[in-house]
Amino acid sequence: MVEKTEMSKFVGVADITENKKIWRMLLGELVGTFFLIFVGVGSTTSGSVPQIAFTFGLTVATIAQGLGHLSGCHINPAVTLGFLIVGEISILKAAFYIIVQCVGAIAGAAVIKVALDGVAGGDLGVSSFDPSLNCAQAVLIEALITFILVFVVKAVSDPGRQDIKGSAPLAVGLAIAAGHLCAIKLSGASMNPARSFGPAVVQGVWTYHWVYWVGPIAGGLLAGIIYRLIFKVRKGDDETDSYDF
């Protein structure tokens, strides 16, 4: 009976059928991803690397501050799967999150396409990597920068930590900005399958699109597992050496 209950909890039927807040949570993920794509992709039209990096990072930080209380503000399938792999979100809830994230990304890309109609360079920031790299290298880079992102998300949302005195959304946003500054000229610095999916659908460009699912998802899953097994704060842990900003 206990095993059946645990399995039911992991699948998460009750999360969808009995949770009165589920539709608000899903709407939060959809709206958050919509604005991430609309604002972030808008910066790729003629922006410099720092401009694009900080636009994406600060957009995520702002959205997380505004919508985090609803759904946790994943707005990224790699983040959602990083929570799923360690049992911190149910299968069905994760599936619904990812679906609405992709829908929001498509909507955001469609609206910005209309807004940028006729604007030079309005390719919607379709994800692509440097021609000097091969697919394996692009996947590795995406996995590594997404690992950093999801690791930071897990760290700042760890309920056992008492040492975090700064802004959790800002920390996540800076992780995204750092990933862009490091890798945008290499892999394109997607770090988010939905971010790549929306523009790909609207533009109809699917060249090596799988790279931007495999890399970020691999990095997100690995970050979730490693943080849970090694770095998660456990009862009785000594935090006397924690930083104090």
UniProtKB/Swiss-Prot annotation:
Domain notes: Aquaporins contain two tandem repeats each containing three membrane-spanning domains and a pore-forming loop with the signature motif Asn-Pro-Ala (NPA).
NCBIfam families, sorted: MIP
Membrane topology field: Multi-pass membrane protein
Annotated compartments: Membrane
Organism: Drosophila melanogaster (Fruit fly)
InterPro entries linked to this entry: Aquaporin-like, Aquaporin_transptr, MIP, MIP_CS
Alphabetized SUPFAM superfamilies for the sequence: Aquaporin-like (SSF81338)
Residue stretches spanning the membrane: 27-46, 52-72, 95-115, 133-153, 164-184, 206-226
Cytoplasmic compartment segments: 1-26, 73-94, 154-163, 227-245
Annotated motif NPA 1, positions: 76-78
Family: Belongs to the MIP/aquaporin (TC 1.A.8) family.
Motif NPA 2 in this chain: 192-194
Function description: Forms a water-specific channel.
Domain of life from the UniProt record: Eukaryota
Example of a GO MF term: water channel activity
Gene Ontology cellular component terms for the protein in this record: apical plasma membrane; basolateral plasma membrane; membrane; plasma membrane
Sequence ranges on the Extracellular membrane side: 47-51, 116-132, 185-205
Keywords: Membrane, Repeat, Transmembrane, Transmembrane helix, Transport
Protein name: Aquaporin
Quaternary context: Homotetramer.
GO biological process, any: water transport
